Amino acid sequence: GTQRKGSGVIIDDNHILTIGYIVVEAENINITLSDGKKIPGELAGYDSTTGFGILKTAIPLKLDALEFGDSDKLTKEEMLFIIPHLNEGKPSAANMVSRRPFVGWWEYFLDKPIYTFPMNHSWAGAPLINQYGKILGIGSLYVTEAYVEGMLSPGNLFIPINDLKPIFDDLIQNGRRTKDIKPYMGLSSQINSGKISVTRVNENGPAAKAGIMEKDIILSINNKKIKDMEDFYKTVWSSGGPGSKLNFE
């Protein structure tokens, strides 16, 4: 649609942390505070590798900000809280039930995302906080199998806050990461009968220019056989930065 909305969390006097897909490519950004006050904002930084987005407010917020926690130390025993904007949904308690990898068909991979249960319906951009009010993650997705693959357990996926820390200054100062940039292929894919099947090729992208087409099957890269989606992405990303040439079979 033409409009998107979601939640975010104040991290300093002029910045709000959210999920990038809510705000990326937006022509206008309007921020509604918890008291109903509306202020204009702009996209200060976006990282397609993790999915984080940071907004800059037009005026200082002069409100309490939340601090970053340590998502690497999160345990399944901790009580967590999902806090969406009050106009978007209700806060809810949750538990971390898994830290397994997540692979997205849109050239996206998270090594240790936080899967929570039960589900909060207003997850997009909502902070996941611990009992001390520290941010541990930002809401990204609804998932049907939070506990383990193959077990129906509707929950949410949060991007760990520790994934933001190495690139935070870059996003604030430069609007994007300037180090460890992953190459972009310009295709969507999925596992089909144990093989990587191309489901879409973006017009004028690197894959299209290389002659890759929808419904192609990718067997190997640089003579290395590909076993699954995770292996596919990691092989591409470890073969060189943007501009590197790869041999696809």
Identify what each model region corresponds to:
Residues Q3-K5, I10-P91, P113, S122, ...:
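Conserved active-site neighborhood of the chymotrypsin/trypsin-like protease fold
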